[in-house]
């Protein structure tokens, strides 16, 4: 999801809109004090120059995500969050608001979402701090083809050799690095590294590894290939239905009426809500922490009940997003008359 009114870490209920708080500034390297002497100090000077270049490179890499206006206004997208177990073999390895999920199996692991171009080191650290191997990532999936969920895919695929599996309607977007997006194609700040897809998915396709099976549900609208993932988890003898919502949100500037680059956008949104309303849900998750009140649920995690088991919250969130869509559609339709 890309939205210009999401500010976390304190997330308001259900809609993913949040209040802004202070953000710890990143460390900025001090200007390097070059050694000016020659002779015996020449080697020190060379080493110093190389060190300065290395530090500056780290700084540039670390701030590359900030080139996009959405990342500067949403610091929670890059703020680390200690990884944790959700249930069974399902773990959270994302940031404070950009969700990424690791599914661990005896035959390797499945990662959902690569997030920003700057996110892979953070995701890797989260995976390894849980005691798992980053190199064991065998399959990489995404929620949808926006830069805040798939810009890190090229690096993760290169480093782990994971098989990249994407819904067919979003394949042209991820393989073009966002240049074929129906709304953001002409905005270079929304482009990301082009990544070759290894398997093209369609609605209802399954992804299986090591005894775990996920089902891909096409829930288009936010993008043409937005994907909601479902799987079952065993937790304390119970079978829990997990739903990872792709995105039901209408971004600022989206045309729901007479959209020349996406004529069926309104129909796709309506179909999405039909699908989401029918899915059985015990554990409610999504592409952004704001969807499922991540910050609030973490405060309850030490209790006896698993706060991520939230079927009521799921139904409320989907109903709210559906109402928001219908209101926006009605508004845009009225403006055309």
Residue ranges and their predicted role:
Residues 67-71, 79-81, 85-87, 136, ...:
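Metallo-beta-lactamase
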Residues 118-121, 128-206, 303, 309, ...:
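Active-site HxH/HxHxD metal-binding segment of metal-dependent hydrolases
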Residues 112-114, 137-145, 164-167, 218-221, ...:
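Active-site neighborhood of phospho(di)ester-bond hydrolases with catalytic His/Asp-centered motifs
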